[in-house]
Amino acid sequence: MYSIRLDALAQQLDAQLHGDGDIVITGVASMHSAKTGQITFLSDSRYREQLAETQASAVVLTEADLPYCQVAALVVKNPYLTYAHMAQLLDTTPQPATDIAPSAVIASDATLGQQVSIGANAVIESGAQLGDGVVIGPGCFVGKNARIGAGTRLWANVTIYHRVELGEHCLIQSGTVIGSDGFGYANDRGNWVKIPQLGTVRIGDQVEIGASTTIDRGALDDTVIGNGVIIDNQCQIAHNVVIGDNTAVAGGVIMAGSLKIGRYCMIGGASVINGHMEICDKVTVTGMGMVMRPITEPGVYSSGIPLQPNKVWRKTAALVMNIDEISKRLKAVERKVDNV
């Protein structure tokens, strides 16, 4: 078990220590579940009453919340960001093996960097290139001439198709498929004719992709995911989509083909975005958004209907379905009033 003295932790986090620096911290936990030896954090002053009840040995908080804290504290400007760094230091995720499993199947002309780890039953095909420190989990498939940058980790059962390019220090969760065929077909008198997808997928550095997400290869040009992008679980990204640097995509999002999303965007969960259009930089789409037109101005956009009691929702739906007729009747009343 990893442990660290509170004063040493304060130094690493650039935090101001209040209380006993000799306390030994062995883990991080939420305010209500933390026990002796663990550290927690308070990032929202609305929950400061929990400070009186927590069993944590120390709390990360702001100067404004310090008077309400009854245990040792680390004072910082941004407790949530500090929590992220603290969790990295106290991470309990198992470290990967540092060898190549005997059951792994590796093509003779695949290129492996230094300190590469490959799990049981993984397959590395001809011409694939793995950079230094790459971790390939059990059951993964890396296709012909794929390239994976240094320090990238694939959890178990990830599929990387031929010629896909992953940057450095990426993290791909289990079940994700990158580089499968895009949904491309031509119609010949009612019969669908498959269009081979001749592009690939190019993913930048420090990209994280959640479990069971699918990213299709391009039809002619490539599907491109920029540097620092984070994508949640069970998203579908169609062929030729381009996502700009540091954009965040929450779970269950569907992006149609040839969509271009700018930098620093945030796409809420279960949103659906039309293809063959652009969304500019610094756009936030709230959850369940349906984006049918280009967005040219930064800002926050919404289209979902918030939760209502069923009886109220039924009335709202009826009004929406009859909005044209209601509008006509309202205009008729306005004309009568104007003529009085």
Curated annotation (Swiss-Prot):
Q: Which PROSITE patterns match?
A: HEXAPEP_TRANSFERASES
**GO biological process: any one?**
lipid A biosynthetic process
Q: Which InterPro entries does the UniProt entry name for this protein?
A: Hexapep, Hexapep_transf_CS, LpxD, Trimer_LpxA-like_sf, UDP_GlcNAc_AcTrfase_non-rep
Q: What class of enzyme is it?
A: transferase
Query: Which GO MF term does the entry hold, naming one?
Result: N-acyltransferase activity
Please name the SUPFAM superfamilies in this protein's record: Trimeric LpxA-like enzymes
Keyword Lipid biosynthesis in record? yes
Fetch the Pfam families from UniProt: Hexapep (PF00132), LpxD (PF04613)
Cellular component terms per the entry's GO annotation:
membrane
Q: Does the keyword Cytoplasm apply?
A: no
Kindly state the subunit structure of this protein. Answer: Homotrimer.
Among PANTHER family, the record links this protein to:
UDP-3-O-ACYLGLUCOSAMINE N-ACYLTRANSFERASE (PTHR43378), UDP-3-O-ACYLGLUCOSAMINE N-ACYLTRANSFERASE 1, MITOCHONDRIAL-RELATED (PTHR43378:SF2)
Protein name, per record? UDP-3-O-(3-hydroxymyristoyl)glucosamine N-acyltransferase
